[in-house]
A protein has these predicted regions:
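A conserved beta-strand->alpha-helix junction
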Residues: 1-24, 106-124
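ATP-dependent adenylation/nucleotidyltransferase module used to activate substrates
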Residues: 1-19, 31-53, 146, 222, ...
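Short catalytic/ligand-binding loop motif for oxyanion handling, primarily in non-cytosolic enzymes
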Residues: 13-14, 58-62, 67, 154, ...
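Short low-complexity, flexible loop/linker segments enriched in glycine and/or proline
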Residues: 19-23, 65-68, 245-247
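Acceptor-substrate binding/catalytic loop of class I
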Residues: 27-29, 208-209
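Short, basic, helix/turn surface patches
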Residues: 28-40, 79-85, 197, 260-265
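Adenosyl-5′-phosphate
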Residues: 45, 49, 86-306
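A mobile, often basic/glycine-rich helix-loop segment
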Residues: 60-86
Length: 306
């Protein structure tokens, strides 16, 4: 038997949480993590040790719409370009030099594409089958994205005097997952490979959005223990509607933090370029929620550690 607790977060909760969150994380983070902060706050009222599901997605293919984008390319370098383009979406490539103008001389030789590529230096990079592309993506996310999640998980739980344990990252289970065939993780790979690339919108609509594909082996294992609606459910992220908050309830908060004349942000970033990108979101033209959250987080860190 389990007991379930519900906490409803509003835009103001994000605003109030930001100083404490930035302090405990000790460094700027791109991913929003205030829902995690409030979940830890609630759990700490009842327990001192919690179990986390971190690692389940990265080991068993929980983000198929990401992997499928780069699954039918010609070679390793093409694969890197395609997969990198998905991850490097915080700032448009055409705007990077403008945004970092105040410190451009210091960062112009830092090529994130090369850093991205170097993750695979110790990995076998022969890409002969669609499964090879998928395994490359899973390897990359386990080596990078997962590490960031674990940092947040650990620091936020410790800020509430709790310990988080991650059963999916048990050594034996990780070894098993790394050897597990792709067809036990993803159901739609065969269809993705065969789809007509010239079919208008077909691939994007079917496979680049959230579906009930992914983590198939976990779904099969648990089908006798949890409701069918969960076994066949779509991937549900642990996030809040900040995209709408930033241009709605929190619009004044965003403008006050990012558009004021005293923020230390613009010792490092170009004001006009940043404001242009932020306004694209506030005007409803482009979803730049991750960019705005990154700016808010960085701005708060500047105040804490200046």
């Amino acid at each position: 038997k389990t007991e379930h607790y519900e906490m409803v977060l509003k835009a103001g909760d994000m605003e109030r949480c930001l100083p404490k969150l930035a302090y405990h994380l000790e460094e700027p983070r791109v991913g929003q993590s205030y829902p995690n902060y409030y979940a830890a706050q609630l759990a700490s009222k009842f327990v001192k040790v919690v179990l986390s599901g971190a690692g389940g997605d990265e080991l068993f293919g929980g983000y198929p719409w990401r992997y499928y984008r780069a699954v039918v390319n010609n070679d390793f370098e093409h694969y890197v370009d395609k997969y990198y383009s998905f991850w490097q979406r915080l700032i448009p490539n055409t705007e990077i030099k403008n945004v970092f103008a105040p410190i451009w001389d210091d960062v112009k030789d830092v090529w994130t594409r090369d850093i991205f590529r170097d993750i695979f230096l110790t990995h076998k990079n022969e890409l002969n089958t669609p499964e090879d592309y998928i395994n490359h993506s899973l390897y990359f996310e386990a080596k990078t994205f997962l590490h960031g999640l674990l940092v947040v998980e650990d620091k936020i739980s410790m800020s509430h005097s709790m310990e988080t344990r991650v059963p999916f990252l048990d050594n034996d289970l990780v070894d098993f997952a790394m050897k597990c065939p792709v067809n036990l993780k993803l159901n739609n790979l065969t269809d993705v490979v065969r789809i007509n690339e010239n079919e208008t919108g077909g691939k994007k609509k079917k496979y680049f959005q959230k579906t009930n594909d992914g983590k198939q082996i976990l779904r099969n294992v648990m089908k006798n223990y949890v409701p069918n609606s969960i076994v066949k459910g779509q991937k549900q992220g642990f996030s809040s509607p900040d995209a709408s908050w930033f241009k709605g309830e929190s619009i004044d908060f965003v403008k006050t933090k990012l558009f004021n004349g005293h923020t230390p942000l613009y010792d490092y970033l170009d004001r006009d370029s940043v404001e242009k990108l932020v306004n694209q979101h506030l005007d409803g033209d482009v979803n730049r929620r991750l960019f705005i959250w990154s700016l808010l987080n960085f701005e708060e860190c500047c105040h804490i550690y200046e």
